[in-house]
Curated annotation (Swiss-Prot):
Homotetramer. InterPro entries: PyrdxlP-dep_Trfase, PyrdxlP-dep_Trfase_major, PyrdxlP-dep_Trfase_small, Ser_HO-MeTrfase, Ser_HO-MeTrfase-like, Ser_HO-MeTrfase_PLP_BS, SHMT-like_dom. It comes from Dictyostelium discoideum (Social amoeba). One of its GO terms (molecular function) is pyridoxal phosphate binding. This is Serine hydroxymethyltransferase 1. It catalyses: (6R)-5,10-methylene-5,6,7,8-tetrahydrofolate + glycine + H2O = (6S)-5,6,7,8-tetrahydrofolate + L-serine. SUPFAM superfamilies: PLP-dependent transferases. The modification N6-(pyridoxal phosphate)lysine is found at K240. Its EC number is 2.1.2.1. GO terms for cellular component: cytoplasm; cytosol; extracellular matrix; mitochondrion; phagocytic vesicle.
């Protein structure tokens, strides 16, 4: 009998990749992950991702595939759809769901492909106001996202108070007449007024979409207002607050469409358009191993344990925000309703990218972010901080207050270095890599972080 290939462990087949995996695991274990779009998924999800489902090609949808041997993946995908609807308490006679998008950006573009024609008009939150690239981002000189290249985009913005200016949104919508209005953001710490946005969309005859990628886990836990009460389409990633694998999902209305007075006016025709946009218009075969991971994550999200986790996410975000404000720092909107805070460093005359690089030396991972009034996208004045990942490791409010102390020390060290070498980033980077204070802080951070379990190990 001949030997069967493919059963040799990774360490023997490719030690180079094996070592990189171990280094990354060590980095995650010893460091403090504060990037708001990241999380730690469970071992169960990882097992599904690494399963034999990765071997199966399955173009099409359950019951209508272009390949044979799909009876098991049909069951898998149908189960994932049912779990998605259940996790968000949706009636399948009124909502459907597509679980095939490879990630959040493809999910959003599939919605645009389904509901719009080239050069139709869209309105999403401006990127410097906390929106996402895929919501129509463009600069004065260049169309950046495909959503602004293939469609005409007019963003809405936040006001000086950091809150969405719904009045101006309505005024501009009445003039611009968009076919699609997009709610949801990647760096907005407050609740959304979906009812107000529904009224605006109805006034101009637009679809209302929500991209809840960042906070879908909090919606599932009923800790934020639900976009499903007012939106026609809802998209999400599955790896942020939902704590699943890296994937995308699209929910869409079914049944009768109603006006603002609750009167049925027409039948929704969204489902077939979105399914056709995902496949065959934009994608080929779905990644069934990822869909398996999504299904596991959705089951986990539909549990009391997850609801307790999501509540702790909110508590921890509030705790670190309050701790920073108590130290005299400024937060956009003076706090948060969700999993993230926006920290304005401009009063300290320190840029977000300098702080990010200094924090990296101390093994604390954050990301620079624009805040209202920023004019330089390359060197924004803010930092975005999220609580989801470290909450998955078991950290509580007191732990996040300790992290605020670490962050405060990084500011002090950074300002001292900037005072010596000047404001050029290149000189600052050279100096922080020689900073004994940052290296000493790194040791404290790693000792602190190593006390907490890393999911999936």
């Amino acid at each position: 009998m001949g030997s069967v290939s493919g059963n040799t462990p990774l360490k023997e087949v490719d030690n180079e990749i094996f070592e990189l995996m171990n280094r990354e695991k060590d980095r995650q274990f010893k460091g403090l992950e504060l990037i708001a779009s990241e999380n730690f998924t469970s071992r169960a999800v990882m097992e599904a991702l690494g399963s034999h489902f990765t071997n199966k090609y399955a173009e099409g949808y359950p019951g209508s595939r272009y390949y044979g041997g799909t009876e098991v993946v049909d069951e898998l995908e149908t189960l994932c759809q049912k779990r998605a609807l259940k996790a968000f308490r949706l009636d399948e006679s009124k909502w459907g769901v597509n679980v095939q998008p490879y990630s959040g950006s493809p999910a959003n573009f599939a919605v645009y492909t389904a509901l719009l024609r080239p050069h139709d008009r869209i309105m999403g939150l401006d990127l410097p106001s906390g929106g996402h690239l895929t919501h129509g981002y463009q600069t004065d000189k260049k169309k950046i996202s495909a959503s602004s290249i293939f469609f005409e985009s007019m963003p809405y913005q936040i006001g000086a108070d950091g809150l969405i200016d719904y009045q101006r949104l309505e005024e501009n919508a009445l003039l611009f007449k968009p076919k699609l209005i997009i709610s949801g953001a990647s760096a907005y710490p407050r609740e959304w007024d979906y009812k107000r946005m529904r009224a605006i969309a109805d006034k101009v005859g637009a679809y209302l979409m929500c991209d809840m990628a960042h906070y879908s886990g909090l919606v599932a836990a009923q800790l934020l207002d639900s976009p499903f009460d007012y939106c026609d389409v809802v998209t999400s990633t599955t790896h942020k607050t939902l704590r699943g694998p890296r994937s995308g999902i699209i929910f869409f209305r079914r049944g009768k469409r109603v006006d603002g007075n609750g009167k049925e006016i027409e039948e929704y025709d969204i489902e077939s358009k979105i399914n056709f946009a995902v496949f065959p218009s934009l994608q080929g075969g779905p990644h069934e191993n990822v869909i398996a991971g999504v299904a596991v994550a959705l089951k986990e999200a539909d549990s009391q344990e997850f609801k307790e986790y999501a509540l702790q996410v909110k508590k921890n975000a509030a705790a670190i925000g309050n701790a920073l404000m108590n130290k005299g720092y400024k937060l956009v909107t003076n706090g948060t309703d969700n999993h993230l805070i926006l920290w304005d460093l401009r009063p300290k005359e320190l840029t977000g990218n300098k702080f990010e690089k200094a924090a990296d030396i101390a093994n604390i991972t954050v990301n620079k972010n624009a805040v209202h009034g920023d004019t330089n996208a390359i060197s924004p004045g803010g930092i975005r901080i999220g609580s989801s990942a470290l909450t998955s490791r078991g950290l509580k409010e007191a732990d996040f207050e300790k992290i605020a102390d670490f962050l405060d020390r990084i500011v002090s060290i950074s300002l001292e270095i900037q005072g010596r070498v000047g404001k050029k980033l290149v000189d600052f980077v050279v100096e922080i890599n020689k900073s004994k204070e940052l290296l000493d802080l790194r040791k404290e951070v790693e000792e602190f972080s190593s006390k907490f379990t890393l999911p999936g190990i």
